Amino acid sequence: MFTSNTKEDLAQMLAEIGVKSFDELLPVPQVLLKGNLNLPSALNEQELTAEVKKIASKNKPLVNFAGGGMQEHFVPAAVNALSTRGEFLTAYTPYQAEASQGTLQAIYEYQSCICALFDMDISNASHYDGATALAEACLAATHLKNNKTILYTKALQPNYTEVLKTYFKNASVNLKEVPLNADGTTDLKQLETLLKNGAAAFILQTPNYFGCLESAEEISSLVHANNALLIANVNPTSLGILQTPGSYDADFAVAEGQGLGNVLNYGGPTLGIFTCKKQFVRSISGRLCGMAKDKDGKRAFVLTLQAREQHIRRERAASNICSNQALCALNATIYLTLLGPEGLKEVALKSLENAHYLRTELCKNAGFALKYKAPFYNEFVVMTKAPAAKLIKAAAKKGFL
């Protein structure tokens, strides 16, 4: 019910502000445009399409070899065709279960796919991006262990490190970096020393930022022996052929899911994958979709365990995260379902083979040498005799990024 302000109410508020009228509160600026805007005449749809194509033709499409960030994978046409159907496409979180069964089922299927892929017990409905998912896992770890120290490998994606620093700037969380060995992997002796000083968790990234594969099982044993939690940050496509986080007993496993059926974009949405062991489910952030029965005994999907969340517990919530990337998660679900285990294995093998072929061909040239000797998946670091900036500029002229 809306009750409007009376004239007396308005007069009292204006007097408190120090003005006599509403017009005086919002004065129109004296400097106004005089004359017509210098704009071309309007175009019809056909003319506008031609003009936009002309502008877009100035872009130079490059063959993408750039590493250290988002990854470009082929997205089947069926992904977009299915994800834009009205039964699934949504602009917001489906609180009203009876009117949102399509969206809720899609989220449930996403969680099921991710749990199977990561070999983990629980997946939430997704976070905003991989960096957010990692920060939320760290936040949960500090609460679970009642310890404000988080260790992370120096080979963690630098953007993620910056997000962690921003997240915990005013939260008294102590972030400590673990150095690397000469082969580009985490120094386990240094890690053990830091763990013995006490820590809530260690962040392992494998493949790491430099493409190197870490000794996940050995690191997991070391972390757990020192009463800390293991947070694994992984490349989801690599799980088609590499060890899953569940297989080496990770407590939390997170990832950037952009490569699963989502196209590259500059500044647009990506997909934060977040998984954990079942005993931590009441300490994590984000939506959780569960399967239930309605009053007639029929299968139904609902948001569950909402007592963890901000709209219920307010300042006592596990986090202030109160939404998810439903469309990106839907794309990932359709992509994984279309490919299946064998299809994802093929994607992973192709990525592995292409990267190793590129390494071999590059290193035949005397101007290139592999920097790290550790095994790698689909990215690697090379050293060059010529300045890197000069090479990048020359490659762009030839059509390569």
What is the meaning of each model-derived region?
Residues 260-366, 370-373:
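Active-site C-terminal subdomain of aminotransferase-like
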Residues 96-99, 116-135:
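Short loop-beta-helix segment that forms the pyridoxal 5′-phosphate
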Residues 1-34:
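Compact, charge-rich alpha-helical regulatory domains located at protein termini
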Residues 396-401:
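A common structural junction motif
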Residues 36-38, 53, 57, 71-73, ...:
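Flexible, glycine-rich loop/tail regions that form catalytic "lids" or insertion modules at the edges
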Residues 1-2, 132-298, 367, 381-385, ...:
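Conserved PLP-enzyme active-site core in the AAT-like
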Residues 86-97, 113-120, 145-146, 168-176, ...:
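Gly-rich Lys/Arg/Thr-decorated short loops/hinges at beta-loop-alpha junctions or inter-strand turns
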Residues 29-109:
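N-terminal entrance/gating region of PLP-dependent enzymes' catalytic architecture
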